[in-house]
Amino acid sequence: MRLSVTALLVTLALCYYEANAIVCPTFAADLTEFFYFPDLLYRLSLAKYNAPPEAVAAKMEVKQCTDRFSVKNRLIITNILGKILLNCTVTDVKAVLNPSSA
């Protein structure tokens, strides 16, 4: 449960920072891969970021914890994160289209 709260807080921090940028589709795809890809495929997916080995190892360690979540709980978490990402994107697009309302 603590990990899902952490993931939620990270997502909120990324969505509601001052720049008002639209949420990167790669971030949304990475969240899905994190929760549903097997370890080997996810490790290959992380290669696109050219992250240091220590960062990849840390991410994989967290993934091993989330892999123990039931499929039902993973669906609940990704559904909530999807709603947050959608809300962030809609809010950011409104700010871009009408800056005086921000």
UniProtKB/Swiss-Prot annotation:
Cite a single Pfam family from the UniProt record.
Uteroglobin
Q: Which UniProt keywords apply?
A: Glycoprotein, Secreted, Signal
**PROSITE patterns on file:** SCGB (PS51311)
| Subcellular locations according to the entry | Secreted
Classification via InterPro entries: Secretoglobin, Secretoglobin_sf
Q: Does the keyword Secreted apply?
A: yes
Is Repressor there in the keyword field? no
Record's signal peptide: 1-21
Listed under GO cellular component are:
extracellular space
Give the primary localization class: secreted
List glycan-bearing residues. Answer: 87
Q: Which family does it belong to?
A: Belongs to the secretoglobin family. Lipophilin subfamily.
Instruction: State what this protein does.
Output: May bind androgens and other steroids. May be under transcriptional regulation of steroid hormones.
Name of the featured protein = Secretoglobin family 1D member
Q: What is the organism of origin for this protein?
A: Bos taurus (Bovine)
